[in-house]
Amino acid sequence: MAGSDVKTTRVTATGAASIGRCRLMQVLVTSAGSGTPELKLTDGSNSGETKLHVDLQTGETDTISVPAQGILFETDINVHTVDDITSVVFFTV
């Protein structure tokens, strides 16, 4: 991965992130002050393979770092669930 340009994309709702095929290297998640924050990412669409599914604490900013080569999204990162989350920033190559 040396020499790859890291790109960032910020989302605040469900649906395609419009990044295209990519490797997810890191996620920055800001959760709401109440509720049960949950983030679920699938490949391409809501019916695509689940690639990342995490529960988070309320009122925090969390960084999720993916080891090695990252998570490959063949089609696009699809934000399936963003319950009680203010924003999500994807770091991709």
Per-range role (PLM):
Residues M1-V93:
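Surface-exposed, low-hydrophobicity beta-strand/loop segments enriched in small/polar/acidic residues
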